[in-house]
Amino acid sequence: MVKIRSRRFKILQSQISVEKMCEPIEAINLLKSGPKAKFSETFEVHCCLDLNTKYSDQQLRASVVLPKGTGKRTKIAVITNEAEVNKIKNFGVDIVGSKDLVESIANGFLEFDQLLTTPDMMPVIAKVGKILGPRGLMPSPKSGSVTSDIYNAIQEFKKGKLEYRTDKSGIVHSIIGKIDFTAEDLLNNLIAIKKSIDQNRPNGAKGKYWKNMYLCTTMSPAIKIDFNKLQELEKNYGQN
């Protein structure tokens, strides 16, 4: 089936050279200056890594706090022991429960974006792992969503912490903000993602780690980023 592209997509596509790599700020400004959609589009980054994810030591899963936030409200759910439920409810969390929430998930309830829990509840949550896992909602110590300091985790995810992981092709797909962010704020968030991926390089990754990086918005074509320029910016760019 032939995919029909919108008029604004074609306009942006005509401004982008498939062969040309753009400096990060140039790519951001080009995407921001294109025809506007009827909603606030999300800026996305797609990081192609030289990882064979069929091996466990080449799988990447981590989290990062975007210094300028995500631009979207994250609906947080917390599973904890019965004694803590009321305290966490008073902390401003959307959904809080214990074994009852696990049971609700088993029955199909998934109306949240991020699930946090404490280590003692993981054996209970494991029962719904087959439901949460494929949706990217299974808590993990690596991503900071399984922690003894649940209150700090709640604050971090509210501020703009997000999880990322490689897909089967070794690509990390993440957001870096909204189209109405300033170019500088989007660049700050992009550098934060890049740094985090470097810092969490899997032990099994040998030789060249990065292949390519692409930026796009929800409704735009992708722009290939000049990775060398991004590395130069990373050395000098302050996260204000």
Swiss-Prot record:
Superkingdom, according to UniProt? Eukaryota
Subcellular location(s) per record: Plastid, Chloroplast
> What Gene3D superfamilies is this protein classified in?
3.30.190.20, 3.40.50.790
A GO cellular component term found in this entry reads:
large ribosomal subunit
Q: Does the keyword rRNA-binding apply?
A: yes
Instruction: Name a GO molecular-function annotation.
Output: rRNA binding
Q: List the disulfide bonds.
A: none
- Record's SUPFAM superfamilies? Ribosomal protein L1
Q: Which GO terms describe its biological process?
A: translation
> PROSITE patterns annotated for this entry?
RIBOSOMAL_L1
Q: Which UniProt keywords apply?
A: Chloroplast, Plastid, Ribonucleoprotein, Ribosomal protein, RNA-binding, rRNA-binding
RNA-binding found in the keyword field: yes
Main subcellular localisation: plastid
Q: How does it assemble?
A: Part of the 50S ribosomal subunit.
- What family name appears in the similarity comment? Belongs to the universal ribosomal protein uL1 family.
Per the entry, what this protein does is: Binds directly to 23S rRNA. Might be involved in E site tRNA release (Potential).
Name of this protein: Large ribosomal subunit protein uL1c
Q: Which gene encodes it?
A: rpl1
